[in-house]
Each structure stands twice: as structure tokens, then as C-alpha cells.
Amino acid sequence: MPHGAAKRQIFRVGAIAQGKRPAAKTPREEETDMTQYDARNISMMMDLYEMTMAHGYFKEDKVGDFATFDVFYRRTPDGGGFAIFAGLEQVLEYLENLHFDERDIEYLRSLKIYDEDFLRWLSGYRFHGDVIAMPEGSIMYPDEPVMTVNAPLIDAQLVETAILTQINHQSLVATKTQRIVRAAQGRSVADFGARRAHNIDAAVYGARAAYIGGADSTATVLAGQMFGIPVSGTMAHSWVMYHDDEYTAFRRFAELYPDNAVLLVDTYNVLDSGVPNAIRTANEVLIPMGKRLKGIRIDSGDLAYLSKEARRMLDEAGLTDCKIVASNSLDEFTIRSILDQGGCIDSFGVGERLITAKSDPVFGAVYKLVAVHEGQACRPTIKISETFEKITNPGRKQLWRVYDSDGWAIADLITKEDESPDFSGAYAFVDPQKPWKRHVFSNHTIRGLRELVMKNGKRLRPAPQLKDIRSFVKRQLDTEVWPEEQRFENPHHHYLDMSPAYYKMKMALLKEAQQQG
């Protein structure tokens, strides 16, 4: 299904957004209408304290107050050099359809926490904020504001949990997948993770994130239908075990799918029966039909050794074009090890360690208040901590990326919102972790990393094609991100610097906060 068509289907929630329920469907209609999968009102997806604080602001007559919150993360999973920003489109769709229906209001009333004036106000609520964000698929680094919400205070508070849920999950999986794709060194990678995902949403949106991160396909059919991701798959051991013998299982499969026969060869013994029976199937079934055996899959054992032996046997049988697919608890480290040992593998099916990011399964993006609007003025706010990394970057700001003459990104830069730095000559940046140091750059190019994507609760552009987001990731990695930053171990540290004016403002706020404390 084309990506645009899928988007129109799965988010056809207009009736619900207006407080109406779709007409009841017959069982057959429920089976075929996939709009029902995502036609869910998730406005109540929040921590209780978000609603409790919103009620408090309402009682304090703060409905008209505005605030600014930044989304950023502090640490890249697996000790990586960068992360991939994913989940933005789901955030924008959530915000655009945010409302509270009768069932939501009735449940909130049952908690006996909130008064009727507030519940009546909620019944007519819509999100009216602005969102500034990096494009989805952007390379991002710790502590920089990848997304900013400028909104009425209550609006901005209510949406924290849902925003972080979507950004954290998809950014985690996209980042992990990209590591796996890099380890595969140009070989195809497929997402095989649905059955080990934490639930259906994690499988489906994890597949979306994996595709953004560079996976070529997914085995999850629902994700293919919803997002237009290419789907792929072979057979299970049960197919082989159900038939009288391995050869019969292979023969029947090849007869049914002569153009896409990939045979699972490790049900009994890879080298003694699996590969020989695959070769026999190619010779006795496919070649007489004018077809070729597309591939074999090995799902257990010593993948490096077995793939080399299988390759030798296939080549000796004249099946040099037959591909070898490997699966079985793979990640970037096992894939790299297999290839370092000379493993003859053309494609990897990666499951649980991709879809759950098993080695480091928490992304850790946060949502912090950085400014309060008082009339026409905007007062920056800062959170201090005993831990340097948890001191927030205050105020409304701009985020830039600096490039050398060859187009490689050398630093990111935070400036005050109203700054217009002159980058035509030499410019000194402050390293906030080592403020005695100055990074001086001259004759470099610079571009802003974020754009206004939502105004007054309405998106300003159509959702991009998922394949274009995926291509954007690849283009950045190929042309902007230093190979040294892409190392798995001890990657080069990407600088996040501050303009002198911004750093001065932050230090003044820190001093003021310390005096108040």
C-alpha cells in the first residue's frame, strides 16, 4: 500500500475527534477495516500528575498562561556517538486529535479529584500549541532540544507523557537498528522482531522505527499494511515438521512459491540434510520450471561456520546465486563477529535484540520547562542538580549545526532565540563542560536544525513519506556524520557548544538559583 494511502486509513479519526463514535460494524467489517486498529482516543495517555497539575493551574486561573518545554535526551544508548530522532509524526497526529470524550470525562469524575468546572472545560478542550522540531530522521546528540512545545501552560503539561512515550520508543529502535545496519556492511537487514516485542504497538511502531533506521523490510504484516514498509519472510520450522520429511516440505513450498522460495535448512541438520535437500529442490523442482532457488535460511548453530560450508555446497551445485539468510538472536556485535570470521551471509533477519533494543533498552528523553511567558516577556527557567548533566539549558533558543568545507558536521550550537550570529568570519563557541575552552571556527557553513511544524494545534505540512525519512537518515550518515562518530566503541564526541551570550545567560540563572536556594 502506498505510504500516503496508509496514512489516510490508519488515522481516519475525525468522528472520534468530534466526540462521535463510529457506527457499529459487522464482524466481517471489523476484520477488513484496518482504520479500527489506530482509531483510538489516546488523550488519556498521561501520568496522573499531568492532569492533577493541569487542574491546579486551572484553579489558580492560569488557563491563559503560556510556557515553553524542550524535549532532549542525556545519554546515547550503547555508548553510541549519536541517535536518530523518530516518532515525530505520531506526536503531531496525537496533538492534532487530542480531545476528551464523554467516557474520559466520566472516568475523571469517578476519581473524585477534579471539580466540575474543570471537567466542563476539558470536555471542549483542543490542543492550541506550537511545535518546533528537527525533521524526523535527524541525527541528534545529547542535551540538545530536538523538539520544543510553546503552548498554553495546561496544554503543554498535559501532553508530556504521550510525547515522551512515542519519541523514546521509536528513537530507541531506530538508533539500535542503524547500528545493526552498519554492522551488516551493506547486506540486507530485515526486522523479525514482532513476536518478541513487548506488545502489538511495540511491534508495529518498532517496525516503523526500524525502517527509518535502515532496515530493508519487516516480517510484521500489519506494519507493512499501515506504513507501506516492504514485507519479507521465509517459512517456520513447523512447516518442515508438519510434512512427512524435509524434502517434501521444501518441494511443496517451492511448488507454491517458485519465485520466492527461501528454505529453512536447520530443522534437523543444516549440512547433512537441510542444504542437500534445498539443492535437490532447486534441481528437481525449480530449475525444470525455469526458476532459481532464491535462498536458504539458517536459524541456529555456528552461523559463521555453517554459512561458509553451505556456501561451498551451493556453489559446487551451481547455485551461486542462491542467497544465505541468517537469523537467531543477532545484534550488531554478533553480526560483526560473524562477518569478521568470514561468514558467507547475504541477509540478516534480526528479532528480539532489535525490536527491544535489548542491550540498552531505555532511551531516556525528557521534557523540561525552559521558559514561562509573562505578558509580552519570556522568563527563562532552569533546573539545577548536583549532577552537571542534569542541569537544564534554559530559555527559548535556536539550534544550529556547523559544517566544515567538505560538508562534515563538526559541532552543534545553541544560541539565544533572538541572536543573529555572524558566521562569515571567525566565531568562538563555549564548551559548556569545559568553559575555559573556546572552539573557534571560521569560514564554515551553518544551518538551523529545527523548523515550525505545528501552529495553534494544526500541522503546517503533510506527513513525509516514510521512505523519504529513511533516505534522509542514510544521506546524513553518508555525507555529514564523521566515520569516527559512527564507531561502536569509543566514538568521537560531537561538540554541543553555546554562544557566549547564551552561556552568559545560563550562568546568570544558575547563580540566581543558587542564591535563592
Write out the residue ranges for each language-model feature.
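Short, Lys/Arg-enriched N-terminal segments with co-localized hydrophobic residues
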Residues: K20-D33
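Gly/Ser/Thr/Ala-enriched C-terminal appendages of enzymes
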Residues: D33-D65, F69, D78-G80, A317, ...
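Buried, small/hydrophobic-residue-enriched core segments of structured protein domains
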Residues: D33-F66, R75-P77, I113, L119-H128, ...
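N-terminal, Lys/Arg-enriched amphipathic/low-complexity engagement segments
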Residues: A67-S123
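Short beta-strand/loop segments at the ligand-binding rim of alpha/beta enzyme cores
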Residues: E316-A326
